């Protein structure tokens, strides 16, 4: 049915299990394999500071997912081993960045304790992950993207050598699937070439710019039913 698989790592999944599943897909099933990573790889302090700086200080979360999820010091050696394994098998190994981000339900948004953040607020976190991984692997690791991609940035991601690019949140906004016309026009203007590597400098610049991008800043809605003084 398919010669490529993406392994979505659930929050709290032990690194040993992630690696065993990926090795099985590569060695036994002989499929190109991507591992989908969680934004918690960045650490609590960075995530909190970045979101606060863009006006998302109302989004609440503590550090327990950051402590329980896959850690950077475990992830990087594992990814190097899996890339070497895939090279020996004549297959491709890469990462999909990133999964959604678990945050607390504080205003009765859902009948649960947690919900999952997606969309443009995820973009500065996911591009930072991409920049860190690109630098660690010298741009040689394939990166697939999901984390706030839309018509305003899809061309920049593609130009960095990051693809495939998937998106959902932007299609849930006014315009729906018709937004793909604008996205397609952006990509049609670019030349497609076989993967030659991720441009480390370009993705680092994209991640840095995302932390102060006006299009990503949250603008609070006016308080409903507020009295206006004339």
Mark where each language-model region is.
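Structural preference for beta-strand elements that scaffold enzyme active sites
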Residues: 4-7, 32-36, 90-96, 140-144, ...
């Amino acid at each position: 049915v398919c010669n490529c698989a993406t392994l979505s790592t659930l929050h709290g999944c032990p690194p040993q299990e992630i690696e065993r599943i990926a090795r099985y897909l590569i060695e036994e099933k002989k499929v190109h394999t991507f591992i989908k990573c969680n934004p918690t790889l960045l650490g609590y302090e960075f995530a909190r500071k970045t979101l606060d700086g863009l006006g998302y200080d109302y989004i609440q979360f503590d550090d327990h997912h950051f402590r329980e999820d896959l850690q950077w010091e475990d992830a990087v050696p594992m990814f190097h081993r899996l890339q070497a394994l895939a090279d020996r098998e004549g297959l491709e190994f890469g990462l999909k960045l990133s999964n959604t981000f678990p945050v607390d339900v504080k205003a009765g948004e859902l009948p649960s304790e947690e919900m999952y953040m997606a969309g443009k607020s995820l973009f500065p976190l996911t591009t930072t992950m991409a920049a860190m991984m690109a630098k660690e692997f010298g741009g040689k690791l394939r990166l697939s993207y999901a984390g706030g991609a839309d018509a305003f940035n899809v061309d920049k991601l593609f130009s960095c050598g990051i693809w495939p690019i998937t998106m959902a949140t932007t299609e849930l906004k006014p315009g729906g699937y018709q937004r793909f016309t604008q996205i397609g026009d952006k990509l049609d203007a670019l030349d497609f070439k076989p993967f030659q590597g991720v441009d480390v400098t370009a993705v680092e610049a994209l991640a840095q710019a995302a932390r102060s991008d006006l299009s990503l800043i949250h603008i609070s809605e006016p308080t409903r039913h507020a009295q206006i003084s004339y």
